[in-house]
């Protein structure tokens, strides 16, 4: 009947069930109202059921029911009818009383059916009419749901055993009334109710409920609260009142703003009704409810039970008084690609009339005006094109609950899955432009809702779904929280710049402007439509910028006259421009990358191995010659500080000739950044530039942070408190990043160093000729010409830039040549000079290369007043096997002389004399017994007759004057040219802080290109011959060596390693090489036996500096400049060999970054134990996954490695005949104890691992 004819009644069909519930109004109301199964307009019964034909139909159906009952009587039905009659008509007068009982039962049944039909939801009605069968089915299902809910409550409380009741406050009924009255007394539309979580009954309800529902308070006594809820909202009420989800009432005490926000977030919406406002209509009113967990005692002395205390506030239409202001009529929605509502903002409730649960999981298109539905296809096409960027679109009309339409101004965006690059959901931001005609949006709709969507709606939904299943194309930004890369175009810039420092800076300069533009475009509005276009335009502009500008700047730099544009001008411009602020995640991510690269030896050596001399000319003249020394130092400091902290080499370009952290080269490092989202407009590429650009940019950075804070507020973050906290965290991290900047102390010490040098008298600087110094710093052009004549192999020592010509800046003693440019170390035409030192200095001959002597126009330091009592042998051209001893006085100490200096130790009164056997023009001086050593010739083939002459002891007076201390300051500033890693910079910082030797000697050994050699051709060929590593060490600036360099045999290994990364143009056993090798061996007092080294020792210290892991030194090491501490050194001077002296020295005297030696096996054992502990928390493959892997990869089953990567040879050795460029690093084949295979391979590559292992023991 009425669409339900096909339903065949079962023995338990509703035809036999209507008497099951007691025919009283309360029980019927309980049976129906407690239902949660309907999802329609349960509150909009219009009373049609009681009119005309519907009443007739009900009467007919009821007569059929009664006849059926009489025809097929059942004992239960007869008994129930008799009991009902007995209750209502207690007469026992035989047959008449029985007839009257049937009549009364018939009337009661009709009333009950009518009551049930009122509660039947609209979607359950057939053709707008409520049939009796459908009504009885709905009543039966409601009864079952009520029973299930009661069982659920009991099961929930028993299973939980009330775990959260420990800290729950307990109140009596009077106390509950007292604590709730202060919140509800101010609002007449608010009431409080306490519902038992055990029985579901109302234990307490405030008096305000009577005027709100226009009923007596007794109507709620001994009743379940869900009886008054709309059936569709019962499940919502249960989900939000689960005990473990409820906050205790104590959190509401005080009610500050933050707690109030939390209270609002915990709230939910339900419709409540007490009874019928009209005879045939139940009208529900929407309430916003905030639940809390309390314990309530019903009676004194009784056990308290857990209750849900609800603060319920009625929600009014946003268009009725008090109206929501038009500018605040904004809400947001999200829907899935198949156009189903996923989330609805609670602000939509008073504007649309729907509760959130009414719209979620319902089609979006159904709620739109039929004429506006086709617009959604165009909107979603643009959503796909925008790639997550917000944009505005034309207004649409949205239907409210009362059936009216409101006009919305919409903005759309989307969230893109970063893995699949597909749209996960669409975000809509809507503002009401035109309100409804009927301002009561909660009123019932006069027209019934569509039960099934229109076919056009279904077709349109399918089109949109197919459209959004396409992957989103990559663009400048990827929308809300997606992980697309904003810096992907950086690799193009890196390739066009060819590692030229100015090219990189120019590209960096262009990037800064572009990113400022994009930042402004994004910060204008949260939904700015043109921001995506500007971003794409900026990327296109960057990619189309010609590399000719880079090449032109590089060409200017290659002019040896020094008249090119100073490189420091670019970073200074960047410094004074306002930099975009960086997020906490970006800076911390970049800092992690920097620290990783600093500690990665393999990355450093790979970079040096891939470097070619062709890139050298791009690193000249960081300071214009016209600049004052102070300005030059300042600009150099700014440049270096910026670059060391921020610029990293691109890991994606292995062929780039940059070091790990290069001082004067600006490199792209976008490939090393883990992108953390595009919520902030500025990319990660400028992360640390404003942090490390010096004190000038701190104000700008602070201003940028304040601007960003303002922009964040405009962007409309969800919580202002969270935004403010985020800004504070960013600023704090930024400040800490400045404080721990690795060049902070270096800048200060360099500034003091320059100031002291400027105050030092000219007499303290020795007999130097300024022109000679200048010439030595201007010899870059000739050195490059000489380099072009030599075989060019991979070079690491020339990866950093050199300083421009600055007056009174001789090379620094003890620095490795690779830390300096050829202009610093290529003093090939300048002979070596002595340097007074508390331990013997050994000036050895320099053999000038033929190119330097014969080439006209070479700038050579002119001889000046002869240094007292000193001569220097110089080998003329063509005299290779013999020493030609001839005096060569000169003013400036420029040649590679090695001396061991102690901090602040005064110099001897006169220069030490050289052995007569080696320098016939000089007298003998007695040899110190503890410092006797032997010096081997540079090459037995080269000097067969001079071996015995070199084995001479040397000593030095120990009564030095104090007047020559200022010579320790005669070195070039730190930022003219530096090494290839922050570790080397720290070591250089520690070298220059004490007033140690700098003036009387150049570097430890010049580069092979500039070092005076015997024959270019033969030297280059000999350099390729594999030779045994020299067993000598470099004792210069011993206070700067760590524990690894305390013994000569360890440094022998380090120097042997250096053969692998020596400069390709190094001459075999050049004078400078002989100097550093021989002196290193002699000063340490170790007897050496060498077969000759085929490379310049200039890169020994480069390898030493560059390969030390950052964990082996303390970045915060304090320089020992105090005189009292340095005086403690005097008692140890010249008493023992240096290794014994260092072993017996107190810890407070030794450098703080030295680490005690550790047993390698013990360290590995500890690491293996830690790894075993960590293995439990590591992810493991399941058996199914392992089976799949074995099927695909057979090598998994064997437990070994695939043949493609199972390489046992040295991957860094290109050829044994081409220089044996292997990298003996333990890090190359780490033994983690994970399998025996790696350990076996480590043993196989013995020469790779053994030197480093022995060094660490």
Swiss-Prot record:
Polar residues: compositionally biased ranges: 35-53, 493-504, 518-528, 541-555, 1033-1044, 1090-1108
Comp. bias regions, Basic residues: 779-792
Positions of short motif Nuclear export signal 1: 109-118
Subunit and interaction comment: Homodimer. Component of the circadian core oscillator, which includes the CRY proteins, CLOCK or NPAS2, BMAL1 or BMAL2, CSNK1D and/or CSNK1E, TIMELESS, and the PER proteins. Interacts with CLOCK-BMAL1 (off DNA). Interacts directly with PER1 and PER3, and through a C-terminal domain, with CRY1 and CRY2. Interacts (via PAS 2 domain) with TIMELESS. Interacts with NFIL3. Different large complexes have been identified with different repressive functions. The core of PER complexes is composed of at least PER1, PER2, PER3, CRY1, CRY2, CSNK1D and/or CSNK1E.
Location of the protein in the cell: Nucleus; Cytoplasm; Cytoplasm, Perinuclear region
Tissue specificity as recorded in UniProt: Expressed in all tissues examined including eye, brain, heart, lung, spleen, liver, pancreas and kidney. In the CNS, highly expressed in the SCN, internal granular layer of granular cells of the olfactory bulb, tuberculum olfactorium, piriform cortex, gyrus dentatus of the hippocampus, cerebellum, pars tuberalis/median eminence, and pituitary, and moderately in the tenia tecta, caudate putamen, accumbens nucleus, superior and inferior colliculus and pineal gland.
Chain spans, region CSNK1E binding domain: 510-709
Annotated GO CC locations: Cry-Per complex; cytoplasm; cytosol; nucleoplasm; nucleus; perinuclear region of cytoplasm
UniProt motif Nuclear export signal 2: location: 460-469
Modified residues annotated as Phosphoserine in this record: 525, 528, 531, 538, 544, 659, 693, 697, 706, 758, 763, 939, 971, 1126
Motif placement: Nuclear localization signal: 778-794
Renumbered residue ranges of the record's region Interaction with PPARG: 882-1067
Organism: Rattus norvegicus
Record CDD domains: PAS
Gene Ontology terms describing biological process: chromatin remodeling; circadian regulation of gene expression; circadian rhythm; entrainment of circadian clock by photoperiod; fatty acid metabolic process; gluconeogenesis; glycogen biosynthetic process; lactate biosynthetic process
Region span, Disordered: 1-59, 471-567, 678-706, 757-833, 993-1044, 1070-1108, 1226-1257
UniProt GO MF annotations: DNA-binding transcription factor binding; histone deacetylase binding; histone methyltransferase binding; identical protein binding; kinase binding; nuclear receptor binding; pre-mRNA binding; RNA polymerase binding
Post-translational modification: Acetylated. Deacetylated by SIRT1, resulting in decreased protein stability. Deacetylated by SIRT6, preventing its degradation by the proteasome, resulting in increased protein stability. Phosphorylated by CSNK1E and CSNK1D. Phosphorylation results in PER2 protein degradation. May be dephosphorylated by PP1.
Statement: the UniProt record of this protein carries the keyword Cytoplasm: yes
Protein name, per record: Period circadian protein homolog 2
